[in-house]
């Protein structure tokens, strides 16, 4: 088992645990970023969980992204996606500041777009995007949260497509 595979498994575990705890405590959030405020309402110091989680995702995703992208002219997509995730994590107060709102929003959109482009053109596991879209749409419909948590579900499609495309590369 390579360091890159171990690192992506750690990132995946962090993502799943963070989301599982957030959903257990608060229900399905409007967006992943909204958990910053939900944790902050619970206890002020808990707001740090969101930025730390975003930082750890990048730290543990990058080895896999770089290894898979090593021979690709599109390796920069991994850096752009990572940069977007880092900016989202460092500008978590998107409801409190106009500047943070812009940085956060554009970074979140960029991170998702660049990650999905990486999945399509570098990982070659483009088929994970429609698969996860269908699975997540079904979950959102069954939980009746497709309207209230649309952003969260779209973010989940991007993250799950990225994680599974990396795992496919290493495990198949």
Where on the chain are the PLM-derived regions?
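Hydrophobic residues within the alpha-helical transmembrane core of Major Facilitator Superfamily
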Residues: 17, 58, 86, 164-167
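Hydrophobic, membrane-inserted alpha-helices
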Residues: 56-58, 110-118, 135-141
């Amino acid at each position: 088992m390579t360091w890159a595979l171990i690192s992506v498994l750690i990132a995946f575990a962090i993502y799943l645990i963070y989301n599982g705890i957030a959903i257990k405590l608060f229900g399905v959030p409007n967006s992943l970023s909204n958990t910053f405020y939900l944790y902050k309402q619970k206890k002020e110091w808990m707001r740090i969980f969101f930025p730390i989680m975003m930082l750890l995702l990048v730290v543990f995703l990058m080895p896999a992204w770089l290894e898979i992208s090593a021979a690709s002219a599109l390796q920069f997509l991994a850096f752009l996606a990572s940069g977007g995730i880092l900016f989202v994590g460092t500008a978590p107060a998107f409801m409190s500041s106009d500047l943070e709102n812009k940085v956060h929003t554009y970074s979140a959109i960029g991170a998702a777009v660049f990650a999905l482009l990486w999945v399509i053109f570098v990982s070659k596991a483009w088929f994970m995007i429609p698969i996860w879209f269908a699975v997540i749409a079904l979950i959102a419909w069954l939980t009746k949260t497709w309207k209230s948590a649309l952003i969260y579900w779209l973010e989940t499609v991007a993250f799950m497509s990225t994680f599974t495309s990396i795992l496919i590369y290493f495990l198949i």
